Amino acid sequence: MALSGNVLTAAQAIMKDEQAHVLLLQAALGSRAISKPAINLAALKVGFNSQNEFLTLSRAFEDVGVSAYGGAAPLIHDSKILGTAARILATEAEHTGVIRELIAQSTGLTVTALDNQDILPLGSSNGRLVSADDNGLTPIRTPSQVLNIVYGGDRFRGGFFPDGVNGAFNAVTSLA
């Protein structure tokens, strides 16, 4: 699959930011950083056959990422790490906006909800340009809710992370 035009430009910019985020988080966490878990891209079953699939997958990653940072913020007690996470969250929100705009501009592209909190982009049923509810707030997800999505509904492992993830939050404990 070859990306082109604004999708390629966005993908390259987002890739650069994501690589920088990994380095920033590793530096902020220091010895508390966890090792990279195994990743199974094939489990996603979308994202690599067309530009529209790439946008669908990118939207899922970015929207879940934004909601994950929002949900994790109350759990971060180190002000330096919280400050870094807040700045990354702002960038991730911009990524989400770019991807959602590209989806809105795509002909015939609709996406399905990831869970009951998902706010779909324009072009989808009840879609919105930005991922915000009637109060102008983006959804937040607890670590368990994020893991439920990336594990494909499993409690301990599966989906995108076939062997689970490392760290204190590694299992789905509650979806409330």
What are these regions (language model features)?
Residues 1-176:
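All-alpha RGS (Regulator of G-protein Signaling) helical domain and cognate RGS-like helical scaffolds
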